[in-house]
């Protein structure tokens, strides 16, 4: 939970 956008960055 934290990085759920684009580009898909780690949490």
From Swiss-Prot:
The answer to whether the entry has keyword Secreted is yes
**Keywords for this protein:** Hypotensive agent, Metalloenzyme inhibitor, Metalloprotease inhibitor, Protease inhibitor, Pyrrolidone carboxylic acid, Secreted, Toxin
Q: What is this protein called?
A: Bradykinin-potentiating peptide 11
Please list the residues that carry the modification Pyrrolidone carboxylic acid.
1
Family that this chain belongs to: Belongs to the bradykinin-potentiating peptide family.
Annotated source species: Bothrops jararaca (Jararaca)
The entry lists its GO molecular-function terms as: peptidase inhibitor activity; toxin activity
Q: Where in the cell is it found?
A: Secreted
Provide the GO biological process annotations: regulation of blood pressure
Coiled-coil region list: none
- Give a short account of what the protein does: Bradykinin-potentiating peptides both inhibits the activity of the angiotensin-converting enzyme (ACE) and enhances the action of bradykinin by inhibiting the peptidases that inactivate it. It acts as an indirect hypotensive agent.
User: Cellular component per GO?
Assistant: extracellular region
Tissue-specific expression: Expressed by the venom gland.
